Design a protein with these regions (language model features):
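Short acidic, glycine-rich surface-loop motifs adjacent to enzyme active sites
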Residues: 41-56, 221-234
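C-terminal non-catalytic interaction/assembly regions of soluble proteins
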Residues: 229-274
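Accessory alpha-helical/coil subdomains and C-terminal extensions
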Residues: 1-6, 118-234
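Internal gly/pro-rich beta-alpha loop/helix module
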Residues: 75-153
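Short beta-strand segments
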Residues: 49-51, 74-77, 109-114, 201, ...
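Short, well-structured alpha-helical segments in soluble
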Residues: 29-42, 214-220
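ATP/NTP phosphate-donor binding region
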Residues: 1-38, 263
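Short Gly/Thr/Asp-enriched flexible loops that form oxyanion-binding sites at enzyme active sites
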Residues: 49-71, 237-246
C-alpha cells in the first residue's frame, strides 16, 4: 500500500495508442485539450500522462511551453514491457501518482526511475536502461522515496524547479480565464500549424546541402520557418555552412544554435562565434 494514494480516486482516459516515435502535432493538440479540461475540473488534483519513452521529453517540453498549469501534470513511462521479468512501469506510475497528488508540485514534470525532472532539462540518454532519463548537469529537481516526494532544492528555490514562462504562457496566465485563453491559443495553433523547424548538424565533411535541402523541401509542414544548428563545441560550425545560413536568414528564416556536447551550453564570449 502507498500512503499518499490511500484516499486518491483514479480515473483513466485514453487519448491515443501509438508508438511514441510516431508522435505528431495533432496528437499533441488533443492531449493538450485533455490536460486543460482536467485542470479546469475542480475535482481533479493532478494529471498523470503515460507516454512512450522515445519522444516523452518533446511532449513534456511542448506542454510546459504552452501554459503553466496550476496543478501537477506528470509524464511517466516504462523502459521494459509489462511482460518483462521485472517491469519498471508499475513503480513509475505509482511514483508519478504520488507527485501528481502533491499540491506543491504544480507544473509539468517528468517522473522516471524515482527521479523528478524539469521538462526543459530532461532527455532520454540511454536506449535500454531503466534509468534512461537524465537532466544533465542540473540533475533531477526531486525524488520519490517510499511514496513521498522530496524536493532536492530548498522551498525558497522552488521557482528554479518550475518551467520558465514563455510569451504564450504569460499571456494565458494573465487572462482571467486560463481555460478559455489556452484553448483559444490551441485553436490558433491547430488552424495555422506549428512553425516548421528543422535541425542541421555540423560535422566533419558536411556540405551546404545540409541547409539548402531543408530550405527547398516542401511537404505537409510547409516552408521552413526556422533552423536549429547543432554545432560543434562552443557554438562553432563548418565554414561551408556560413553562406547558406546567411542566405536563409536574409530570407526570413530564424536561426538558433545549440551544441552537440552532452553537457554544458553555449557561452557567448571572446572565444565564441557571433
Amino acid at each position: 500500500d502507498v500512503e499518499c494514494l490511500a484516499s486518491v480516486q483514479i480515473e483513466t482516459r485514453q487519448i491515443a495508442q501509438m508508438d511514441s516515435k510516431d508522435m505528431d502535432h495533432a496528437t499533441w493538440f488533443v492531449l493538450a485539450r485533455a490536460v486543460l479540461a482536467a485542470c479546469a475540473d475542480e475535482a481533479v488534483a493532478g494529471i498523470v500522462i503515460t507516454h512512450g519513452t522515445d519522444t516523452l521529453e518533446e511532449t513534456a517540453f511542448f506542454l510546459s511551453q504552452l501554459f503553466t498549469p496550476s496543478k501537477p501534470v506528470v509524464l511517466t513511462c516504462a523502459m521494459r514491457p509489462a511482460t518483462a521479468l521485472s517491469p519498471d512501469g508499475p513503480q513509475n506510475i505509482v511514483d508519478a501518482l504520488c507527485v501528481a497528488a502533491n499540491p506543491s508540485a504544480d507544473g509539468v514534470w517528468v517522473v522516471a526511475a524515482g527521479a523528478v525532472h524539469r521538462p526543459t532539462q530532461v532527455a532520454k540518454v540511454h536506449p535500454y536502461r531503466t534509468d534512461a532519463f537524465s537532466s544533465g548537469e542540473t540533475g533531477p529537481v526531486g525524488v520519490v522515496e517510499e511514496g513521498r516526494l522530496r524536493w532536492l532544492h530548498p522551498a525558497g528555490e522552488k521557482s528554479f524547479a518550475r518551467s520558465p514562462s514563455t510569451a504564450a504562457s504569460r499571456q494565458i496566465e494573465g487572462s482571467s480565464n486560463l481555460g478559455t485563453a489556452a484553448n483559444a491559443l490551441l485553436a490558433r495553433l491547430e488552424s495555422n500549424g506549428l512553425p516548421r523547424v528543422e535541425w542541421v548538424v555540423s560535422h566533419a565533411g558536411v556540405t551546404p546541402a545540409a541547409v539548402t535541402t531543408c530550405l527547398m523541401a516542401g511537404g505537409e509542414g510547409g516552408a521552413v520557418r526556422g533552423l536549429v544548428l547543432v554545432c560543434t563545441g562552443n557554438g562553432t560550425f563548418h565554414q561551408c555552412l556560413t553562406k547558406p545560413l546567411r542566405d536563409a536568414e536574409a530570407c526570413g528564416v530564424w536561426l538558433r544554435r545549440s551544441t552537440r556536447c552532452i553537457q554544458g551550453s553555449i557561452v557567448v564570449g571572446a572565444t565564441s562565434v557571433d
